[in-house]
């Protein structure tokens, strides 16, 4: 069983509490990511939460990576994470999924 928490901000439950409940992935809320290029404190918060999750075996998913600069800021400092955002693929229609996956796997 995989338990994923969506829209995580770190405000209501700690990462340690989520681990106690068997959470295996945390999808960080876009609001945490969107200003990491503007505010050092936002970047440091994302780095801390992502590393803390990764260190105890929860896979962080950083949602809303839209620019190369955002990715560069997190790629070496956020532990073992997954990234999602327009930098990698824009939203697509379900009917386009197979075609898009085939193009990505070439």
Segment roles from a protein language model:
Residues 1-106:
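EAL-family c-di-GMP phosphodiesterase catalytic domain
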